[in-house]
Amino acid sequence: MALAHRLCRLPRLLPLAAAAAASKPYLPGKPSPAPPPPLSSPPPFPSLSRLFSTTPSSSGDSSMVVVGSAESFTSIMSKVEAEKLPAVFYYTAVWCGPCRAMAPVISKLSSRYPKIPIYKVDIDMDGVGSKLSDLKIFSVPTFHFYYQGRKTGEVVGANATKLESTMESLHKQL
């Protein structure tokens, strides 16, 4: 958080640094240095929606589903348990660096195993907090694997190898 605070203050400090550089005293007998180039604003950061895009692969066979509300999360979880469906729940957050690192792996797995839906759940979504503590989600990324309506596996952290092997095991059970 301190880094973000420092980064937020950076644009306010840049004009001060430019003014200090421009106010250097003139020394006779020495050529004046060329004036610094005008300050330009940094390029904008990509939008969070682009960083966490869940657009299906070009073949259109992705099984990634973004859970949009606490109500839909509860509904999906109930359906998976009641109908004994295979599923993966991917608990993530937009501010999570390891989650961003795992995004391409998850995208690849959702295309490789289209019969296993992957439900992407943002832990910062309103109304989800109590459900997450009931499920013992304490860090992200966390992946829960369901088979025949019950949780059969869990991967915590950005461990691509373990994630792929657990997904393969779930696929073999189908």
From Swiss-Prot:
It is found in: Mitochondrion. Transmembrane segments: none annotated. Residues 1-59 form a transit peptide. The keyword Protease does not apply. Gene3D superfamilies: Glutaredoxin. Disulfide bonds join 96-99. Keywords: Disulfide bond, Electron transport, Mitochondrion, Redox-active center, Transit peptide, Transport. Probable thiol-disulfide oxidoreductase that may participate in various redox reactions. This is Thioredoxin O, mitochondrial.
